[in-house]
From Swiss-Prot:
Pfam families: Phospholip_A2_1. The active site is at H65, D111. GO terms for cellular component: extracellular region. It comes from the Eukaryota. InterPro entries: PLipase_A2, PLipase_A2_Asp_AS, PLipase_A2_dom, PLipase_A2_dom_sf, PLipase_A2_His_AS. This is Acidic phospholipase A2 PL-I. Gene3D superfamilies: Phospholipase A2 domain. The lineage of its organism: Eukaryota, Metazoa, Chordata, Craniata, Vertebrata. Binds 1 Ca(2+) ion. Its EC number is 3.1.1.4. GO terms for biological process: arachidonate secretion; lipid catabolic process; phospholipid metabolic process. Snake venom phospholipase A2 (PLA2) that may act in the hemostasis system of the prey. Exhibits hydrolytic activities, and prefers the anionic micelles (dPPC with deoxycholate) (793 umol/mg/min) to the zwitterionic micelles (dPPC with Triton X-100) (591 umol/mg/min). PLA2 catalyzes the calcium-dependent hydrolysis of the 2-acyl groups in 3-sn-phosphoglycerides.
């Protein structure tokens, strides 16, 4: 086996395990998007952590997604950041499959709901990389 490290080769952060699935769900609902690039540093809640009042509808989608992940963690042994699940994308429609266990089904529905929310929310480039201390208290 060959291991190649790309650390430092790109300014884009690697996706934690299952977040690649969330990334692909967003691509399903917003074809042509680059979710990890477009949404990882948006508003007060899109990306790592979150606090304060969401700056707009899209940021509220991220806040709701964060809250959903908090709820998922209440299931025994359920880690939403690493939990893989089964889903399908067909012509922009996402379906969480019935073979998911309770944790996977919950996380899948968190991601599905967020991807649909993202697709419906306006994207304001002024809300990318905002001053969190000034806008998110």
């Amino acid at each position: 086996a060959v291991c190649v490290s790309l650390l430092g080769a790109s300014s884009i952060r690697p996706l934690p395990l299952h977040l690649g699935q969330f990334n692909n769900m967003i691509k399903c609902t917003i074809p042509g998007s680059t979710p990890w690039w477009d949404f990882s540093d948006y508003g007060c809640y899109c990306g790592y952590g979150g606090s304060g009042t969401p700056v707009d509808q899209l940021d509220r989608c991220c806040q709701t997604h964060d809250n959903c992940y908090t709820e998922a963690q209440k299931f025994s042994g359920c880690s939403p950041y690493t939990r893989k699940y089964s889903y399908e994308c067909s012509e922009g429609t996402l379906t969480c499959k019935s073979d998911n266990d309770e944790c996977a089904a919950f996380v899948c529905n968190c991601d599905r709901s967020a991807a649909i929310c993202f697709a419906r929310a306006p994207y304001n480039s002024n809300n990318v990389d905002i001053d969190l201390e000034a806008h998110c208290q």
